[in-house]
């Protein structure tokens, strides 16, 4: 099976965990797109009813609305029952790097408001230690070059996330700097260091935030219980 087939398998499998009446966090990314497509199909067929979606990006919101899924702003709900999202890397101890799609800030806010968080990935995303995938940090535009320079001095090998010939803009109109770290020995210490740097809004380190992971494999979807 190719990677897209594994993503589709995983996305469809995750919809089995969505029940009628739920408030569901809808993530962002290529695997989540398959999940939202399947959810929309089941909503249209009347198999899942009265659900509300809270999205982690404007593009997921558009996709969901086009499929007939009711969408509400996160501040218009008091909780989220289940959030289903992708991940760029998941370590052996279920820590994650997210933000390859540029939605890390909204993703973390939605995850924090959720009773349960599920990540859906193909098996290529499972790693022993985090760090091979570039770690995104979201920065406000004002003074962002100074933040970039500080990260460079620390040896974190920063690069600007680009959108064509311009700097990529998040849904909050911020920039993203990707850090090429190779391997992260202490994710918590790194997260604490980065979040205390003035100008950094959020990091792509998602630590102790996931409950279950569905992994797409050639033998079929596999569910891993994190906590």
UniProtKB/Swiss-Prot annotation:
Q: Which residues bind substrate?
A: 28-31, 85-88, 98-101, 125
User: CDD domains attached here?
Assistant: RPI_A
Q: What is its EC number?
A: 5.3.1.6
What pathway is this protein a component of? Carbohydrate degradation; pentose phosphate pathway; D-ribose 5-phosphate from D-ribulose 5-phosphate (non-oxidative stage): step 1/1
Q: List the keywords (alphabetical).
A: Isomerase
State its role: Catalyzes the reversible conversion of ribose-5-phosphate to ribulose 5-phosphate.
| SUPFAM superfamilies in the cross-refs | D-ribose-5-phosphate isomerase (RpiA), lid domain, NagB/RpiA/CoA transferase-like
* Annotated InterPro entries: NagB/RpiA_transferase-like (IPR037171), Ribose-5P_isomerase (IPR050262), Ribose5P_isomerase_typA_subgr (IPR020672), Ribose5P_isomerase_type_A (IPR004788)
Catalysed reaction(s)?
Answer: aldehydo-D-ribose 5-phosphate = D-ribulose 5-phosphate
Q: Which family is annotated? A: Belongs to the ribose 5-phosphate isomerase family.
> Any S-S bridges, and between which cysteines?
none
Give the Pfam families listed for this entry.
Rib_5-P_isom_A
Organism source for this protein?
Limosilactobacillus reuteri (strain DSM 20016) (Lactobacillus reuteri)
Its domain of life? Bacteria
Q: How does it assemble?
A: Homodimer.
GO BP: pentose-phosphate shunt, non-oxidative branch
| EC category name | isomerase
**PANTHER family reported for this sequence:** RIBOSE-5-PHOSPHATE ISOMERASE 3, CHLOROPLASTIC-RELATED
The residues responsible for catalysis, as annotated, are 107 (proton acceptor)
Which protein are we looking at?
Ribose-5-phosphate isomerase A
Entry keyword Isomerase: yes
């Amino acid at each position: 099976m190719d990677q897209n087939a594994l993503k589709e398998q995983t996305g469809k499998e995750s919809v089995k965990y969505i029940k009628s009446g739920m408030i569901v966090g809808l993530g962002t990314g290529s695997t989540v797109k398959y999940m939202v497509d399947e959810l929309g199909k089941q909503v249209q067929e009347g198999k899942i009813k009265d659900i509300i979606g809270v999205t982690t990006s404007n593009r997921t919101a558009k996709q969901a609305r086009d499929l007939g899924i009711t969408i509400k702003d996160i501040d218009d709900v008091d909780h989220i029952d289940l959030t289903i999202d992708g991940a760029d890397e998941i370590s052996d101890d279920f820590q994650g790097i997210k933000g390859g799609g540029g939605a890390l800030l909204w993703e973390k806010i939605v995850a924090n408001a959720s009773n349960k968080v599920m990540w859906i990935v193909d098996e290529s995303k499972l790693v022993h230690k985090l760090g091979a995938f570039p770690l995104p940090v979201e920065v406000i535009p004002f003074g962002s070059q100074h933040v970039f320079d500080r990260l460079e001095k620390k040896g974190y090998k920063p690069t600007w996330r680009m959108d064509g010939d311009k700097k990529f803009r998040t849904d909050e109109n911020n920039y993203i700097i990707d850090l090429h770290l190779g391997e992260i020995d202490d994710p918590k210490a790194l997260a604490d260091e980065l979040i205390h740097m003035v100008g950094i809004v959020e990091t792509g380190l998602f630590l102790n935030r996931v409950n279950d992971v569905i992994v797409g494999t050639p033998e079929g979807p596999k569910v891993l219980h994190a906590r």
